[in-house]
């Protein structure tokens, strides 16, 4: 089980990313634009640098919904490999069966 503070920090980051996604993407578009002037590009870069670090999507890390475990995360199920194995063996995940051939 992950620390509650680590899970809370990750949730806070997700909210910040979601709230600032539109503004950040517009600034990035201007900074990479071929038609914008150099001054506009520089202003966009400065504005991006002034934004909080936690608003950047790269700082997000996927965590298990049940335990908060940051490693061994399965995207399709949004849980860790350990929780997946336990739930699959107990038949709690629909459509998942143990392989046999």
UniProtKB/Swiss-Prot annotation:
Disulfide bonds: none
Sections of the chain in a coiled coil: none
Keywords: Ribonucleoprotein, Ribosomal protein, RNA-binding, rRNA-binding
Alphabetized GO MF terms: rRNA binding; structural constituent of ribosome
SUPFAM superfamilies the record matches: Glucocorticoid receptor-like (DNA-binding domain) (SSF57716)
Recorded GO CC terms: cytoplasm; small ribosomal subunit
Record-level GO BP terms: translation
HAMAP family assigned: Ribosomal_uS14_1
Function: Binds 16S rRNA, required for the assembly of 30S particles and may also be responsible for determining the conformation of the 16S rRNA at the A site.
Complex formation: Part of the 30S ribosomal subunit. Contacts proteins S3 and S10.
Protein family per UniProt: Belongs to the universal ribosomal protein uS14 family.
Protein's name according to its UniProt entry: Small ribosomal subunit protein uS14
Organism for this UniProt entry: Chlamydia felis (strain Fe/C-56)
């Amino acid at each position: 089980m992950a620390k509650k503070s680590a899970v809370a920090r990750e949730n806070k980051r997700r909210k910040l990313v979601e709230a600032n996604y539109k503004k950040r993407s517009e600034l990035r578009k201007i900074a990479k634009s071929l038609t914008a002037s150099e001054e506009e590009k520089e202003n966009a870069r400065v504005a991006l640098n002034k934004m909080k670090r936690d608003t950047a999507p790269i700082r997000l890390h996927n965590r298990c919904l049940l335990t908060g475990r940051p490693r061994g995360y399965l995207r399709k199920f949004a849980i860790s490999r350990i929780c997946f194995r336990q739930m699959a063996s107990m038949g709690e995940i629909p459509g998942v069966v143990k392989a046999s051939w």
